[in-house]
Amino acid sequence: MVKLVVGIGNPGRQYVWTRHNIGFLFLDMLASRFSGAFREAPRLFSSFMKVETSCGVIVLIKPSTYVNLTGKAVLAAKRFFGVSVEGILIVADDINREFGSIRFRQDCGAGGHNGLKNTTQVLQSNHYWQLRLGVGRPSNPESEGVADYVLSNFSFNERKSLNGFFEKGIEEISPWLGF
């Protein structure tokens, strides 16, 4: 059985440490547990890393589209690898959760996240799994809008705590991945 794990993020060096790229950062941590590297796949609108485990194949996907067009890459990978919607896990930032909190579940809404909205629209289904990683809200929403906040870099202290945060996330999804 093949499973897709898709990290939501924006391509480009200027976005590497932004809150919106937490999905890419999480995938980097997950990928470090396996041997291999991400390969560019223009036809899939992403880079990917294919991992064979005793429980099946896991394909890690980093879309090369921007966040709002994530569904295009998800659909291309779904078709190419022959994965069911239920075999897809999307890793995304969540401003409605405190920094460091996690939610893992299936059949849920987008919660205002444009990448998840687009994915649901393109797949015509919300039956995929979501790992929502809390990034918090702007401390002063009147002076810093949500878009500016998710495109801002993590603070020094937040960056220091990402590994522990991601370890919790990996532990949460391990049964779904089959290890």
Swiss-Prot record:
Signal peptide: none annotated. It is found in: Cytoplasm. It is an enzyme of class 3 (hydrolase). The keyword Hydrolase applies. The record marks 10 as: Discriminates between blocked and unblocked aminoacyl-tRNA. The keyword Hydrolase applies. Its main location: cytoplasm. Belongs to the PTH family. TRNA binds at residues 15, 66, 68, 114. It comes from the Bacteria. The active site is at 20 (proton acceptor). One of its GO terms (biological process) is protein quality control for misfolded or incompletely synthesized proteins. The record marks 93 as: Stabilizes the basic form of H active site to accept a proton. This is Peptidyl-tRNA hydrolase. Pfam families: Pept_tRNA_hydro. Hydrolyzes ribosome-free peptidyl-tRNAs (with 1 or more amino acids incorporated), which drop off the ribosome during protein synthesis, or as a result of ribosome stalling. Keywords: Cytoplasm, Hydrolase, RNA-binding, tRNA-binding. SUPFAM superfamilies: Peptidyl-tRNA hydrolase-like. Monomer. GO terms for molecular function: peptidyl-tRNA hydrolase activity; tRNA binding. InterPro entries: Pept_tRNA_hydro, Pept_tRNA_hydro_CS, Pept_tRNA_hydro_sf. It catalyses: an N-acyl-L-alpha-aminoacyl-tRNA + H2O = an N-acyl-L-amino acid + a tRNA + H(+).
